[in-house]
């Protein structure tokens, strides 16, 4: 007679195999190998299926997201929102069991994973957020935050560069609340890992500053797995990597081979597995009653733990009313009342400044006003201007470099890691509004994480400075050309390119208020004038008419540093007897959400429209009839010389505006916005 633990593990394996079989698609190998570890970890975790967002829950992150049949089986067994019927519809359209875990679809899924290496990196971000939240609000007599984050990672996750970036930082930051389980099954899609992955992973992680524990028989030895978890939780100054030596597809006729990784098992294989577990061979999605009762007991215990925590929170609010009210506000997802009053406002009389400097002004203005507004830079603090005056770094207290309640994170030269960590910080909850700085061109290093930000609805903020050839002498290796076109093509991503101080404040206002999409704020190195006609209110529409003439002959639509040049071009055209409106379009995403009536009032029928932006013209045809941009790489030189060389001058723009007018003269012209669908 198998023990309850053995029966539960077999049930997890059975549900996972049946889900993949029902879909005729998926990955049965990892769930078969990892089921024992999953059972042990979930029995040690504190969580409440009826309140899956409880802030002090332990988090489980499946970095090897292809093994999601395992996670879905656990969510069914512990009675989250998922049901057996959802499992039966694994990987089918319209159900909560997609082919890789999606946090927006499925309660109990902490982060969206699939691209390998992202999950462990998100877990580092969750651990950072927990540390920061705990250090900010825990008191000597009341501990409100003491949760752990557990993550399962495969060989592929550890091959990806992003996991190296974030694991290195996790070791430096001494994140002892992070426990990672490496599924060392020695198999990749190409076959045995001997063909490509032969480094000493435990030694690598020790060098990062991690504890490393090993379970050599993780297919069956749940006592050893449990002991390893207990040992990991004793750590006071290191994250822990637990090496689980497993067999992929354990028990299958094809165990230990890459054939069992990403294809359903054959019917005869499934039958022999079920027979070995003592299950009926012809019964699918079998859940023994005693397993349900066993797991329900753990849930009941956890619900008591949450009630005790809620009583502790109530006591905390009485003893520490200011902090208690702040915690409740954050848990409610609300920002501090009146925070937008601190946003800087500008007039044309104010001196020209680089928009990166104007961004710094916003960060300084909001420092201390929004406690959950935290951020950092990928080793470019002095260039990105992302550190508020008087802020404390997020660092282990033992280093003497800061404290865990610090609000500024030194990410090092780890752009991709920074992006994935930012996603984890957002996923933690507590209304974190976190930002990361680098050069715009190097946000491309983090494209994988940025795409997942948008897919996951994480309202993270990228402070992306040095946004064009205007950065000058560093040359085309650093000058973005295709970057904004790429980012604007990502669904659910707001890409701001503000033209002056009011537009910078608007970009931050929108980004901080967002609860469902990330933002990239592209900022200049060079100084720009404060514009007549700009305002936070106007910019919050994503696009607006900055220079308005009656019955214009042409409209020049632009963004960022080219807006002021376009205004000068309008003045040049006026000398030539041409009336030119100038439209500032700092964010396509926000502008597209405005009413048709408003958008057509800005970019109307009957007037030729010329777009001007000193980078790729790709995407501008949606808003203009003709496009003036830079569809080649830049060059090294002084910014002013580059703008002149590429003809991004008032005269160069005016010349192209005249050509646009001439080309469309006498032609019936609809707005580019005027479309069938």
UniProtKB/Swiss-Prot annotation:
It holds the Pfam family Transketolase_N. SMART domains: Transket_pyr. SUPFAM superfamilies: Thiamin diphosphate-binding fold (THDP-binding), TK C-terminal domain-like. Its EC number is 2.2.1.1. The record marks 27, 261 as: Important for catalytic activity. The active site is at residue 415. One of its GO terms (molecular function) is transketolase activity. It comes from the Eukaryota. InterPro entries: THDP-binding, Transketo_C/PFOR_II, Transketolase-like_C_2, Transketolase-like_Pyr-bd, Transketolase_bac-like, Transketolase_BS, Transketolase_CS, Transketolase_fam. It is an enzyme of class 2 (transferase). It catalyses: D-sedoheptulose 7-phosphate + D-glyceraldehyde 3-phosphate = aldehydo-D-ribose 5-phosphate + D-xylulose 5-phosphate. Binds 1 Mg(2+) ion per subunit. Can also utilize other divalent metal cations, such as Ca(2+), Mn(2+) and Co(2+). Binds 1 thiamine pyrophosphate per subunit. Mg(2+) binds at residues 155, 185, 187. Catalyzes the transfer of a two-carbon ketol group from a ketose donor to an aldose acceptor, via a covalent intermediate with the cofactor thiamine pyrophosphate. Homodimer. This is Transketolase 1. The lineage of its organism: Eukaryota, Fungi, Dikarya, Ascomycota, Saccharomycotina.
